[in-house]
Amino acid sequence: MRQSRSTTGLASVFALLVGCASGPRPAPPASGPVTLTADEVRTLVASADARCQLLVSRQERDAGHADAVRAHQAAPRDRSAGLTLASCAQLRADFETDEARVLAITEQGAEAARLASSGPADAEAAYLQAVNLGQYVQAKGLVAIGRLSELVSLLKTASAKPEIDQGGPLRVLGLLYVRAPAWPVGPGDLDAGLDLLKQAAAKYPEHALNHLFYAQALIEADDHAAARRELDQARALCTAERFGDWAARWKKEADELAAKLR
């Protein structure tokens, strides 16, 4: 049985969490023809699934991403290979600081998820396409603001299965509504964001980002007392045993927000 795919919930889309690379990393291999047997593809996908997890080293995650790239290049229409590459790509990109690498990795990840989709109602593929597209948009900046509507559409599709990534579709769409510019420039809607993030924190209380993102929305709504409570919960959940390398950066963000509320 394959392990569940881990995602970080599009944190980098809104620059809430700043990547801290330990040094230059090679860009993902360029797309090209790769000939592998079906068994070899399955072996690579299994290896990538095992390595692209929150609780492994960055070196292992990068190696898993490389495995996923090879599998997808050999079988670009294979659903498992495509979804695995999309998952590995957004995890790898979240710790990259070089814009060109982020763009290459996430563009490839989003396209892999799109090709893997079984149709317009495929929530898992939509979510993985969204988290990669979100990181791509963040790296591109204002020139990519026109793609926010595409992000909203993908996340609405993903929300049919809110349990993905422990409330991932709810918290990512909620944060997008909170952070994006409002109509007519963008899809921003604080009330809608608050509602989605409240649901995420209530239904999936074990994920730190649900509380951290809800606190962000509550601060925007000037409900500082409730925001402090959510930040306390987020910080308590931010342990390396739960979230690996991401725990320290999420806790730092929560600490900084809490300090501003004093």
Question: Residue locations for each model-derived region?
Answer:
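N-terminal leader/linker segments that initiate helical-solenoid repeat arrays
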Residues: 21-94
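Helix-turn-helix repeat elements of alpha-solenoid scaffolds
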Residues: 55-69, 99-111, 144-152, 185-194
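TPR/TPR-like (Sel1-like) alpha-helical repeat modules
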Residues: 152, 225-240
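Short coil turns that delineate tetratricopeptide repeat
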Residues: 76, 120-121, 163-164, 205
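Terminal, low-structured helical/coil segments at or just beyond the last alpha-helical repeat
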Residues: 236-262
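Short coil/turn linking the two alpha-helices of tandem helical-hairpin repeats
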Residues: 48, 53-55, 91-100, 135-144, ...
